[in-house]
């Protein structure tokens, strides 16, 4: 009887230890190039996402004369990088007042290009991305060095197949990727 209880206890301990090991995630060390946006690949290595330049009729560095809706556009129908719906994204951000975390946004197709809707507000410089196109992230700070934080941006839910961008303040450096039906399975 003691042998049976011992075996049952051993099985329970095995399940508990196994589930704890599975629950732990690999947290990568910060890479040397802090200017790039990274994803964790299948081999648990950080790989940089390619950048594209966004074009827009608005001038985000100028103070807006009126409040209006417009767009940011990326040339081409598809991004070069294809990610899985739950791919982990890592970025360096500045931890200062007025600095914003780059946002994951859903892009819509438009005549061979990809777009996101933006709004400018009278009297302010910059732009706001339409809230229905922002992917709400779970943000986790991993390491901090001075006023720079290495963090993980993870969508709260799996991404649907489509085109996405990670947009910060510099429209010449927009990281893009797509989630295809094949990568979603």
PLM region spans:
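Short, flexible, glycine/charge-rich loop motifs used to bind or transfer phosphoryl groups or to couple energy/partner
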Residues: 79, 154-155
């Amino acid at each position: 009887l003691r042998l049976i209880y011992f075996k049952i206890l051993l099985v329970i301990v095995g399940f508990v230890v196994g589930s704890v090991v599975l629950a732990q995630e690999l947290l990568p060390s910060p890479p040397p190039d802090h200017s790039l946006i990274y994803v964790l690949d299948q081999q648990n290595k950080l790989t940089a996402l390619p950048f594209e330049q966004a074009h827009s009729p608005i001038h985000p560095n100028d103070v807006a004369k009126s409040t209006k809706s417009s767009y940011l556009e990326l040339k081409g129908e598809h991004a070069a990088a294809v990610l899985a719906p739950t791919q982990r994204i890592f970025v360096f951000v500045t931890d200062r007042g007025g600095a914003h975390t780059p946002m994951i946004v859903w892009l819509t197709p438009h005549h061979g290009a990809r777009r996101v809707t933006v709004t400018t507000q009278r009297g302010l410089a910059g732009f706001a991305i339409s809230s229905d196109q922002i992917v709400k992230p779970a943000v986790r700070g991993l390491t901090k060095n001075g006023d720079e934080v290495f963090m993980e941006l993870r969508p709260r839910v799996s991404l649907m197949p489509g085109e996405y961008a990670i947009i910060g303040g510099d429209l010449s450096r927009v990281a893009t990727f797509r989630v295809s039906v094949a990568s979603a399975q």
